């Protein structure tokens, strides 16, 4: 694919919308939103969802503090709705080429996931990519020397696990890398294990490609060579899981953005890396681009 065709696929965003609530963790998505807005030539907006008009003035004041502006600033939006995710997406639909950028502060498992319930609900209903700042972006580990400003490293890491679903977002990841001027690295985290004793027998990994992982990423590199020039691939062998493996990789090889593909299963957001994908948001020290998979891959 030539450079002109790649530019046609590049994401275009005029607004970056940050959902706010009453916690400091929601406000902590603002630096990431500003970095995205600077790259896209966009403006940062906020949205808060309340159950009553009586709260509107107080909430607008909160949005003003987050944006360091006046409460009458038109970039501050307040939706009245008992359904937070519906209010956020309704606001996003009214804005010009909007990108939702949110934070999640969940540090423990709730309902089988490491993603907070409100963030999970917003992601579940998204039909376009959403950027999520996880707890290590919101509240960085002081001992992590790889931490940089949001999008401060020109490298995008796209996570795959050997399934068609996980690879469904690679075209979007490549377009984002091109638009942001980042190098694209495709990473798979695999449990180290010996090959099957019998030729043709299935692999039995707990996580990672159910085949030779090095051969798998070599094949991906060949497939995507024209569409993503300069792409490189990495296999991270980790016996514990996807989250710890990716976290160690990012500490040794910093990135500005991580991408993972998501899908819905029975109306519960099920990321294609299973629990490992929720671990990625939870464990990543950089924002995560969550890409909805096409329906045919879910």
Where are these regions (language model features)?
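Hydrophobic, ordered structural segments
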Residues: 47, 78-80, 85, 92-134
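A short acidic, glycine-rich active-site loop
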Residues: 204-215
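CheY-like receiver
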Residues: 36, 87-91, 245, 249
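Glycine-rich, Arg-bearing micro-motifs that act as flexible, cationic patches
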Residues: 103-125, 140, 257-283, 293-298
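Glycine-rich phosphate-binding loop signature in dinucleotide/nucleotide-binding domains
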Residues: 93-97, 249-255
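Charged docking surfaces used in two-component/phosphorelay signaling
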Residues: 79-86, 236-245
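Intrinsically disordered, low-complexity Ser/Thr-rich linker and spacer segments
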Residues: 138-154
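Small/aliphatic-rich secondary-structure junction motif
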Residues: 2-58, 63, 68, 72, ...
């Amino acid at each position: 694919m030539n450079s002109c065709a790649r530019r046609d696929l590049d994401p275009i965003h005029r607004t970056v919308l940050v959902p706010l609530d009453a916690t400091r963790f929601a406000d902590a998505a603002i630096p990431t939103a500003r970095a995205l807005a600077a790259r896209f030539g966009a403006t940062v907006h906020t949205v808060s969802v309340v159950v009553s008009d009586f709260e509107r003035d107080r909430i607008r004041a909160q949005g003003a503090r987050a944006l360091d502006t006046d409460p009458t600033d038109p970039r501050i939006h307040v939706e009245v709705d008992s359904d937070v995710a519906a209010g956020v997406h309704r606001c996003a639909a009214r804005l010009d080429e909007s990108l939702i950028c949110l934070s999640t502060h969940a540090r423990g498992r709730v309902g089988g996931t490491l993603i907070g319930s409100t963030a999970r609900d917003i992601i579940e209903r998204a039909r376009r990519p959403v950027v999520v700042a996880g707890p290590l972006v919101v509240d960085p580990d002081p001992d992590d020397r790889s931490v940089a400003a949001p999008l401060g490293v020109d490298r995008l890491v796209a996570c795959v696990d050997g399934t068609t679903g996980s690879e469904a977002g690679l075209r979007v990841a490549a377009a984002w890398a091109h638009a942001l001027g980042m190098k694209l690295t495709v990473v798979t985290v695999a449990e180290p294990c010996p090959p099957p004793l019998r030729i043709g027998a299935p692999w039995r990994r707990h996580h990672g490609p159910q085949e030779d992982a090095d051969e798998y990423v070599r094949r991906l590199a060949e497939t995507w060579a024209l569409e993503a020039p300069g792409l490189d691939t990495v296999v991270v062998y980790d016996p514990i899981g996807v989250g710890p493996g990716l976290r160690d990789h990012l500490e040794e090889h910093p990135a500005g953005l991580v991408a993972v593909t998501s899908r819905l299963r029975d109306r519960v957001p099920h990321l294609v890396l299973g629990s490992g994908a929720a671990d990625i948001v939870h464990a990543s020290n950089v924002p995560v681009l969550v890409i909805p998979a096409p329906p045919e891959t879910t």
